[in-house]
Regions:
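Sequence contexts marking disulfide-bonded cysteines in secreted/extracellular proteins
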Residues: 72, 89-92, 188-190
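Surface-exposed, interaction-prone regions with an acidic/low-complexity signature
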Residues: 72-73, 112, 116-117, 218
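Extracellular/periplasmic catalytic domains that process cell-envelope and extracellular macromolecules
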Residues: 74, 105-108, 209-212
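C-terminal cap of thioredoxin/glutaredoxin-like
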Residues: 2-51, 174-240
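Short pre-active-site segment immediately N-terminal to redox-active cysteine/selenocysteine motifs
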Residues: 79, 84-87, 213
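Structural alpha/beta surface segment adjacent to cysteine/selenocysteine redox centers
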Residues: 86, 92-169
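A short beta-strand-turn-helix
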Residues: 61-77
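Ser/Thr/Pro/Gly-rich low-complexity linker/stalk segments immediately outside membranes or between
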Residues: 49-62
């Protein structure tokens, strides 16, 4: 076989390998997307089974219609929405990287932020931590909305590892106390799961909207796929 024939054969083989690699990559991406949606659906299914579907969901008075906790001007023209799960490591990373940027923009009245806690990762703890933490966030908002941002930051600073029991209800109460919340009703709200059914209903609503992963960050309804501080500032400027 001539050298030229060998080179042609090698080139053809390399081309096939390249195509196979690209095909495998696309398949992996597709599988990952399906798994994200499936995991979210499983999370909601578990949450639904753990709630009393016949009981009316107690609705907090401090939230938006979609269950979001608004930080900043109630009438802001630019609103950043953050759909999050307190068990979600990527949510902790987002808070660490972009949380201060959002706080600064809220402080100078550039934006308001709607934090929307849902529970799609209950399966990642043995105590339905996602639901309990989301319930606690609503209890805190009802007790003292001004202290909610500090509590929110502390929750991610102390995020438990996946696969463990998660923080106990007493620990959730303690974090709220450390954030300066003194309400007498707070403890019973958290330990009694006052808003558990509401969390379940809002999680279902989020999934019905097509939200299948956390964090999902949007500016005036437009999703920011890589919500770094620079990307958020650019999206906010475009929305003004």
């Amino acid at each position: 076989v001539s050298n030229e024939s060998k080179k042609k054969a090698q080139a053809a083989a390399a081309g096939m390998q390249g195509k196979d690699k690209k095909r495998r990559t696309l398949i992996q991406i597709g599988i990952a997307a399906v798994l994200v949606a499936l995991i979210a659906a499983i999370g909601f299914s578990i949450a639904s089974k753990n709630s009393d579907s016949d009981a009316p969901a107690a609705a907090p008075s401090s939230t938006q219609d979609n269950g979001a906790i608004r930080i900043g001007d109630p009438n802001a023209s630019v609103v950043v929405s953050v759909v999050e799960d307190f068990q979600c490591p990527a949510c902790k990373q987002f808070e660490s990287i972009s949380g201060d940027t959002l706080a600064e923009l809220v402080a100078d009245n550039t934006i308001a932020v709607d934090y929307r806690p849902i529970a799609i990762l209950d399966r990642m703890s043995s105590t339905n931590y996602s639901t309990r933490a989301a319930n606690a966030s609503l209890c805190v908002a009802e007790a003292d909305a001004s202290a909610w941002p500090a509590w929110h930051k502390a929750m991610f600073d102390q995020q438990p590892a996946e696969g463990a029991a998660g923080l106990s209800d007493d620990e959730l109460v303690a974090i709220a106390r450390q954030a300066g919340i003194e309400s007498q009703e707070l403890s019973s709200c958290i330990t009694g799961g006052t808003y558990t059914d509401y969390v379940t209903s809002q999680t279902k609503a989020a999934l019905d909207e097509g939200i299948s992963s956390t964090p999902t960050v949007s500016v005036n309804g437009k999703v920011v796929s890589n919500p770094t501080p620079d990307a958020l500032r650019a999206a906010i400027t475009a929305a003004q």
